[in-house]
């Protein structure tokens, strides 16, 4: 379980040290050990959510993230220590939509812990991580984050620390302003490539693409953790050629074999998109800078043939 620092979501080109992995829950504490941090805790499933929550929380709560960097949340399995570590948290923040609901199947794991689904108030796009679910990747649209995620984060953390409600609300307002500025920056950065199509490693970018006028034509990985079949890859090649695609994107959390094969067949370059980022990932170690990174990558890739 990774701790998030209590600081603003990262802006452009910044970096900072992050705390180490937590000690096992319930370990004994002798008199010569450092005193425990008694700050109330909140748990977030993925890094972007944890980073947003850490800013809103400030020093009022310690936010811990379950999924480590470079892991795929849709195939992630929490360890027994991580499951045990949820006990006693003041809030459990999850995305929902079938992507990060692993603990809901563990009897008693969330007993007594208030659970908040960020996607609970959003009409999800088609194309989810599980049977009958919609696309859960709503955090890649900063307007949805500002208008839907942020109020839920604020309410959950204020309920966890009612004595700190005014400070939590003030930090949420400041974050809303930063998200508005990010949206404006992305809209301007992507304006020259509006209407252009790209192929991603997996279908994570529908909300982002719809917000900023680009088109996610298709994805290499149709199922989490599985490389595409030869037939599926051939169909994607035909569709990409017909649409004039000249960029393919990989992601750090998924295998590159299919994406590299597709790019070689199309004779187009490969770029990196990162839906999750993480502590210590240069240029992607905070929500704001992560979205800027991805917007810049798409703008560069789609603008390279203009």
Segments the model singles out, each with a brief description of its role:
Residues 29-306:
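Extracytoplasmic metal-acquisition and chelation regions
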Residues 2-27:
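Sec-dependent bacterial lipoprotein signal peptides
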């Amino acid at each position: 379980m990774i701790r998030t620092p209590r600081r603003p979501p990262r802006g452009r080109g910044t970096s900072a040290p992050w705390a180490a992995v937590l000690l096992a829950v319930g370990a004994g504490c002798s008199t010569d050990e450092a005193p425990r941090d008694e700050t109330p805790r909140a748990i977030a499933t993925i890094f972007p959510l944890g980073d947003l929550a850490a800013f809103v929380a400030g020093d009022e709560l310690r936010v811990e993230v379950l999924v480590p960097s470079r892991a795929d949340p849709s195939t992630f399995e929490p360890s027994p220590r991580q499951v045990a570590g949820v006990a006693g948290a003041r809030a459990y923040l999850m995305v929902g939509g079938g992507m990060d609901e692993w603990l809901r199947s563990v009897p008693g794991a969330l007993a007594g812990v208030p659970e908040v689904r960020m996607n609970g108030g959003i009409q999800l796009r088609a194309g989810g991580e599980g049977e009958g679910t919609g696309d859960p990747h709503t955090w890649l649209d900063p307007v949805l984050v500002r208008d839907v995620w942020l109020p839920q984060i604020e309410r959950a953390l204020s309920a966890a620390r009612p004595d700190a409600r005014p400070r939590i609300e003030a930090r949420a307002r400041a974050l809303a302003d930063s998200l508005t500025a990010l949206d404006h920056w992305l809209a301007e950065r992507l304006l020259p490539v509006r209407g252009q199509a790209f192929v991603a490693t997996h279908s994570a970018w529908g909300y982002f693409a719809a917000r900023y006028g680009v088109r996610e034509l298709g994805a290499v990985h149709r199922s989490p953790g599985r490389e595409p079949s030869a037939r599926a890859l051939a169909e994607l090649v035909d569709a990409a050629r017909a649409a004039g695609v000249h960029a393919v994107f990989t992601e750090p959390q998924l295998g590159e074999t299919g994406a590299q094969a597709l790019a070689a067949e199309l004779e187009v370059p490969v770029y990196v998109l990162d839906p999750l980022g993480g502590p210590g990932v240069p240029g992607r170690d905070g929500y704001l800078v992560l979205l800027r990174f991805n917007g810049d990558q798409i703008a560069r890739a789609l603008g390279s043939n203009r």
